[in-house]
């Protein structure tokens, strides 16, 4: 692509870069738009992660460089050093961990990945530091909470990969799918409730006797105890299947053949007290909707904003409400097709890469 902004530079620091999860893909995708416009990218991190970023996140950079991580000590000297270095950047992005600093870059952005009050306690000194910064939020839900805390932000939601919108002409199978990392802390995906609800609906209604529950998610060593607990409550039921650390291509294949998608993240949590512990956006439900799965989400956080109950998917507040809605829709093929069509159109209209790219470009023009 033609270099529209010759010699301009973009900087990034995120203390979470070693995670390389959805949040990291989001912020890296944002700066990738800048690279495509001809800008050079610089990340403050001691290790060159281009290979890992390509393998794990599917993002390839041609003009990305890594600089020594001067932030890791969080000393006065390191922040002073950054103040001198940052004048070389036209744009600088920072994923906050609750700390803030002065920057002499021309334009500065705090990227807000979660509506956690502890990350945005802006005392007088922090407000001084942020006089030349603008906030970007990852979802309408995060934006709403930042606004409640007196912070204005510009929403740039992540995008859904183009392949998810290309529906394969294959018959949907008797599968209920849940996708999300296996862990029992913070905003857990609550696969335990999916298992219990699945057992309950199979016992109650013969229409679901041939269904399988497939639980897909990333699994780390430190989360093995929670995973073992899930296997225990599944109690050897052969219709409950666990799939760990699958490639994106294999996950995509499951979406394509799945009939129903369940998402329990945030279940039982009061989002008005702990908004950080419910689903902030809900990428997996959006992927499911794009792939023609009838999607059911716990009524909190991002999904509550995104899904129009009974039109683009379904929301539930209790396990029994989920079961009732499943029973009501299982035999109504006409309604199923109508909802699938609406959901696919909604995601395509609001979460395609083209929509994402234009949001980022508007940010550049805006500033």
Q: Where on the chain are the PLM-derived regions?
A:
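Acidic donor-binding loop of glycosyltransferase active sites
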Residues: 256-280, 293
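Donor nucleotide-sugar binding/catalytic pocket of nucleotide-sugar-dependent glycosyltransferases
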Residues: 132-166
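A short, well-ordered alpha-helix in the C-terminal region of glycosyltransferases
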Residues: 328, 335-350, 356-362
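Conserved acidic donor-binding segment of nucleotide-sugar-dependent glycosyltransferases
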Residues: 308-310, 314-320, 328-334
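Active-site donor-binding segments of glycosyltransferases and PAPS-dependent sulfotransferases
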Residues: 40-99
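Nucleotide-activated donor-binding/catalytic signature segment of Leloir-type glycosyltransferases, i.e.
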Residues: 227-252
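Short hydrophobic beta-strand element within catalytic cores of glycosyltransferases
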Residues: 285-297
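Conserved donor-binding/catalytic core segment of Leloir-type glycosyltransferases
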Residues: 168-189, 195-200, 214
């Amino acid at each position: 692509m033609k270099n529209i902004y010759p010699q301009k530079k973009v900087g990034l620091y995120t203390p979470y870069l070693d995670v390389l999860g959805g949040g990291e893909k989001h912020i890296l995708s944002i700066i990738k738009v800048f690279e495509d416009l001809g800008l050079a990218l610089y990340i403050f991190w001691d290790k060159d992660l281009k290979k890992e970023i390509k393998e794990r996140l599917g993002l390839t950079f041609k003009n990305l460089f890594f600089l020594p991580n001067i932030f890791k000590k969080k000393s006065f000297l390191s922040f002073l050093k950054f103040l001198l270095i940052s004048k070389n950047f036209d744009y600088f992005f920072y994923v906050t961990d609750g700390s803030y600093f002065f920057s002499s870059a021309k334009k500065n952005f705090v990227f807000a990945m979660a509506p956690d009050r502890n990350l945005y306690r802006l005392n007088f000194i922090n407000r001084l530091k942020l006089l030349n910064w603008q906030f970007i939020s990852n979802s309408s839900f995060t934006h709403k909470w930042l606004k409640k805390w007196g912070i204005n932000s510009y929403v740039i939601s992540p995008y859904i990969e183009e392949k998810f919108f290309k529906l394969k002409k294959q018959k949907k199978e008797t599968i209920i799918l849940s996708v999300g990392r296996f862990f029992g802390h913070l905003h857990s995906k609550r696969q335990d409730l999916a298992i219990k609800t699945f057992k309950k609906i199979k016992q109650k209604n013969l229409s679901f006797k041939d269904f399988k529950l497939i639980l897909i998610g990333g699994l780390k060593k430190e989360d093995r105890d929670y995973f073992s607990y899930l296997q225990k409550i599944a109690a050897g039921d052969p219709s409950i299947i666990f799939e760990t650390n699958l490639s994106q291509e294999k996950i995509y294949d499951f979406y394509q053949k799945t009939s129903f998608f369940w998402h329990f993240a945030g279940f039982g949590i009061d989002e008005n007290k702990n908004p950080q512990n419910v689903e902030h956006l809900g990428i997996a439900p959006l992927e499911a909707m794009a792939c023609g799965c009838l999607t059911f989400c716990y009524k909190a956080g991002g999904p509550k904003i995104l899904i129009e109950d009974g039109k683009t998917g379904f929301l539930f507040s209790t396990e029994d409400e989920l079961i009732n809605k499943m029973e009501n829709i299982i035999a109504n093929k006409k309604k199923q097709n109508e909802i699938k069509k609406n959901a696919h159109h909604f995601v395509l209209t609001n979460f395609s890469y083209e929509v994402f790219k234009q949001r980022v470009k508007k940010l550049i023009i805006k500033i």
